[in-house]
């Protein structure tokens, strides 16, 4: 399977919000780097990280417009969005969307690194307005 095909499956599994299926495509030493440069290392830690994020934003989604492959690296340009849950409620005013890019490293058909580039201001504005605290 080409690296781009692996990443398309990874994006699809993010949209399914099934952390176990998502983890199946991560290498044991998977590395996640968020848009602030914070890193989570390891498949099991990232499985828990995704579970926490899907609790925080239960309808989180990603989409792609452009994908470029260079060897085992894949660059994805698209958008992400969802609704921030506040006290378990998904209110329309807590819906967000942001242009997003991802850079992935694929080895042996698994995602070894997933790096996010996004402007998180829409999420921060919702958190500030609602006094919501992410639960991870």
Residue ranges: model-predicted function:
Residues 23-28, 40, 76-78, 100:
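Short amphipathic alpha-helical segments, especially helix-boundary/capping motifs
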């Amino acid at each position: 399977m080409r690296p781009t095909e692996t990443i398309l499956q990874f994006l699809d599994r993010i949209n399914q919000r099934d952390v176990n299926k998502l983890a199946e495509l991560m290498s044991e030493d998977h590395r996640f780097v968020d848009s602030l440069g914070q890193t989570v290392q390891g498949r099991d830690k990232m499985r828990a990280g995704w579970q926490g994020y899907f609790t925080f934003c239960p309808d989180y989604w990603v989409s792609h417009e452009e994908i470029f492959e260079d060897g085992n690296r894949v660059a994805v340009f698209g958008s992400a969005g969802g609704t921030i849950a506040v006290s378990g409620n998904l209110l329309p005013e807590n819906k967000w969307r942001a242009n997003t890019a991802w850079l992935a490293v694929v080895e042996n058909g698994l995602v070894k690194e997933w790096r996010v580039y996004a402007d998180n201001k829409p999420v921060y504005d919702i958190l500030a307005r609602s006094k919501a605290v992410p639960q991870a």
